[in-house]
């Protein structure tokens, strides 16, 4: 009986989905090109139009307010409101909302501790958790129906009021810059400015080599000067590698999120109704992965910023 009941439930959901898929395929743009069917009004989906730059929907003086900027503000507002709701009237014995907030914080803290250790976990937690929550919230909120469907008219034309923030290259770039600043300031604060910068620019061995030459120790002096130049060159490469992190952060997030949005738009257009549902599930997974990668790499770089120094002490 239990087996037949489960089968009936599966058929109850599977058959309507299959019917919707068949209708969407036959009468949608893809099926109409094969069978010559006419697309009914309820299946008509606007043709996908990909615009990489964010569209301005308003102006404040010379400052353009774009739809991705509005989406970013909306994400921040949602995070603030949710944090207030989940942490309202906190008690020693947590309720459901407080337990949910504690589970999120504890999960992120355990994630940070697993990489940085307890010594540095709390110092790195705020930056890493903020980046994770902001990136994943941008990704998940963009899947709601009102993103792209609510339009406004401006002097430049009619545009969507909300557009996925992560699909504007400026948003991933701004997060990457903040990640870079967070890691570098953390390294300077933890070790001291001069100590931290000495990993990149260090003339001590080169100066020591010249001192050896003045003392008449030619072999040792030349050796120290040569290795001093090598260390200086390696330091310049290290500076360059730190700067290029921002580029890799930016285009990884921007590329994956933009590709996901295009995939959903195209699948919804070709076969309306249910064909795009699996891709929404895929975007949920990709949003989580991208948030983990962005915050995880920030965590790793923050840990590396102090680890080599501690090993030499």
Predicted regions and their residues:
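Selective transmembrane helix interface/packing segments
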Residues: 1-313
């Amino acid at each position: 009986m239990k087996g037949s009941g489960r089968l009936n439930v599966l058929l109850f959901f599977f058959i309507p989905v299959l019917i919707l898929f068949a209708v969407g395929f036959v009468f949608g743009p893809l099926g109409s090109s094969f069978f010559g069917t006419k697309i009914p009004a309820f299946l008509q989906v606007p043709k996908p139009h990909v615009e990489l730059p964010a569209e301005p929907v308003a102006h404040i003086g010379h400052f353009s307010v774009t739809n991705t900027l509005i989406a970013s503000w909306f994400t921040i507002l949602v995070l603030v409101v949710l944090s207030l709701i989940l942490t309202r009237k906190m008690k020693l014995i947590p309720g459901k909302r407080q337990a949910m907030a504690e589970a999120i914080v504890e999960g992120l803290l355990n994630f940070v501790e697993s990489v940085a250790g307890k010594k540095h976990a709390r110092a790195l937690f705020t930056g890493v958790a903020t980046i994770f929550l902001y990136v994943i919230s941008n990704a998940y909120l963009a899947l709601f129906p009102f993103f792209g469907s609510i339009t406004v008219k401006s002097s430049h034309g009619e545009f969507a009021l909300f557009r996925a923030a992560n699909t504007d290259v400026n948003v991933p770039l701004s997060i990457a810059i903040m990640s870079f600043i967070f890691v570098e300031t953390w390294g300077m604060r933890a070790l001291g400015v001069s100590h931290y910068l000495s990993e990149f620019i260090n003339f001590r061995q080169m100066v020591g080599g010249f001192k050896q030459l003045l003392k008449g120790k030619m072999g040792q002096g030349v050796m120290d000067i040569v290795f001093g130049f090598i260390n200086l060159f390696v330091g310049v490469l290290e500076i360059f590698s730190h700067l290029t992190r921002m580029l890799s952060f930016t285009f990884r997030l921007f590329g994956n999120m933009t590709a996901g949005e295009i995939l959903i738009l195209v699948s919804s257009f070709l076969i309306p109704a249910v064909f795009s549902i699996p891709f929404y599930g895929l975007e949920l997974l990709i949003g989580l992965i991208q948030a983990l990668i962005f915050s995880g790499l920030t965590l790793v770089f923050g840990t590396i910023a102090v680890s080599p120094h501690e090993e030499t002490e």
